[in-house]
Amino acid sequence: GTTIDEMPLERYMGPGLLVDLRGKVLDNEPVTLDVLKPFDLKPERIRDKIIVLYTGWVEQAFGTERAYVDNPYMAIEVAEYFVGAKVRAIAVDFTVDKLPPGQPPQDGDCPIHRIVLPENIPLIENLTNLDKLVGREFELFALPIKIHQGDGAAARAVARVL
């Protein structure tokens, strides 16, 4: 896929659509299409939007040992659905892939990244303050540090409420 320094900046900013999943996704459980079904995420509604999945995970686990061990994660079917719907980006308040505890990622350990990034759909992970966007229309801006041939980078993410 496209590296951070090659990705058009427009992919990192645009209209957002927040999906409030608090209380609907448990620790160590995937966000599945069944979980998303009640939210009317038809392709024509989410095309070219930044989909923001809000589970409340960062608020309860950030800075703890649990943050990357017990996190909810994205099911492969959801990543494939978002790719097919041609979303602009996927933003979450957790880590999208479930990794083996206490080990750095190995080849093949990050299926969501391998599905989404080759389609030039950025993943924006571990967002905070999403409670301020519940029920509101907004634009999201999450511009990553430009790293030559990088496949990930820290970003300053901000939203403009409309």
Q: Model segments located where?
A:
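Active-/binding-site microenvironments in catalytic and ligand-binding cores
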Residues: 1-162
